[in-house]
């Protein structure tokens, strides 16, 4: 795994816009529009494919698979498992968003099953979800975290080892735990959690960068954090933030990303 630095992150943004990778999303009803538009604004190509009948074809030519369990049910679960099998067969990364893990036994069980099955895995979650994945007691209110991101770093280290993956913890401070290093990013804005699907957007962008290279979640976290920060400065509230975020992702340039990014690496 490459140790990420600001120059590498900037180069990945340029490469994504050049390659325009296709990202397969099995995601929830609430955020499909948000995440598809964010992927398009950044320069990727989203497809919201949920049918098991076409998944083998989709994974043969796409760049990565995003699985979001936000509106989980008995119909979606086998489709998700089959999609992971196809991603493994095609050596594609799987980005898992274990929405509400810890809030119900079903969500926790399915999240762990997917994490166990995926060969090339990145987990993007809030602190409570990461702690629940690790098997510890977490405080959650539905799909929202009541634990702070820094309190979940130890659990993230355990999860990263258990599933041989990278773990992205979203919060006031974002943390990424890989097999080789830990990263801390201090971008973003306090208004961002008031837009539904912001974490799901984070997961989708992680899938886009995973489709073009050696992504662990650091690049997507950096890009969304800086873009969200800029968009919030131009917004009166969550409604305008949602629109301004798309514009900022579309307009984000290398100089702005380099200048504003607050990244700490512990290798």
UniProtKB/Swiss-Prot annotation:
Its EC number is 2.7.1.50. SUPFAM superfamilies: Ribokinase-like. Gene3D superfamilies: 3.40.1190.20. Substrate binds at residues 48, 197. Its cofactor is Mg(2+). Pathway: Cofactor biosynthesis; thiamine diphosphate biosynthesis; 4-methyl-5-(2-phosphoethyl)-thiazole from 5-(2-hydroxyethyl)-4-methylthiazole: step 1/1. Belongs to the Thz kinase family. Catalyzes the phosphorylation of the hydroxyl group of 4-methyl-5-beta-hydroxyethylthiazole (THZ). This is Hydroxyethylthiazole kinase. It comes from Aliivibrio fischeri (strain ATCC 700601 / ES114) (Vibrio fischeri). The gene is thiM.
